[in-house]
Amino acid sequence: MTTKLPKILVTGATGQVGGKTIDFLLKNKDIEIVAAVRSPKKAVPFTEKGIATVILDFNDDSTHLPAFEGIDRLFMVTGYTVHMLRQSKVLCDNAKKAGIKHVVHLGACGPDDATVGHWVWHQLVERYIEWCGFSFTHLRPQDFMQNLLSYGSEKSANDGVINAYVDDACMSWVDVDDVAQVAAVTLGDPEKHNGKTYRLSSDAKTFEEIAELMTTIVGKPFRYEPLSPEIFLQKMKDAGAEMAYMTCVYEHWIRHANGTIPGASDTFDNFFKITGKKPTKIVDFIEKHKAELDY
């Protein structure tokens, strides 16, 4: 008698965290993986690897139930606009109708009493997931180390100059690979990780300290030049970004710079407990990506 393998749907599959999560899930032979994409064109890289795909558009509710058919577990990764609130609610409602049992949600930084705008939005989504009655695991990563390589479409370090909007704040960091590894583990063993909220960060550094490490490891001079958060806000306006979300980001840069976000440099020892592996430190990340940082 053949046992039916649990089927996991990964949203955000073409993004950094979702894509890496699929890479880690491929090592688990006790599950089936389905990648959610918005168009047949975006499905091609997955089908070439033998990974099943479904069309799922958060803004097109009619795609939800067909995409959820036969799915047991959901990795929920929403976009970076205020529309994430409506998208998340409707997605959860339809996931419940489809019989999905476990939801792993990729949220944002902060403790339960966080007051940073977009962090709070993610926590409201967490509460709705719980209210719907799913078994759940909430992931709350701190700042991605990948932002040291690029932020949006811009390089973060140009000719050895690192720009950021947080003055001399010490921030906590996590590698996207580590977040994805935790996501894969929790999706693979929902019983063990049910009801858990995992804040994820393995290292805390200022940008000055990061510049010093880059200088040592890359072998060329790096320096940090802080920028005003006003520059970020204007860039977002000029780019035509959805400003409800980006205004929250702007305000959180100001709070980082002023040192008014409690626990902004907190780190956690849960990665090893969850995965059995050592987490990535900033020095490890720079070593791994020194060719990209070279100039």
Residue ranges of each PLM-predicted region?
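Cofactor-binding loops of NAD(P)H-dependent oxidoreductases
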Residues: 56
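A hydrophobic C-terminal alpha-helical subdomain
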Residues: 2, 231-295
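A short hydrophobic/small-residue beta-strand
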Residues: 53, 102-103
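Oxidoreductase cofactor-interface core, primarily capturing Rossmann-like NAD(P)-dependent enzymes
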Residues: 2-45, 59-62, 66-71, 80-89, ...
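Short, conserved active-site loop motifs that form the nucleotide-linked donor/cofactor pocket
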Residues: 50-52, 136
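Catalytic metal- and UDP-sugar-binding loop of GT-A-like glycosyltransferases, i.e.
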Residues: 77
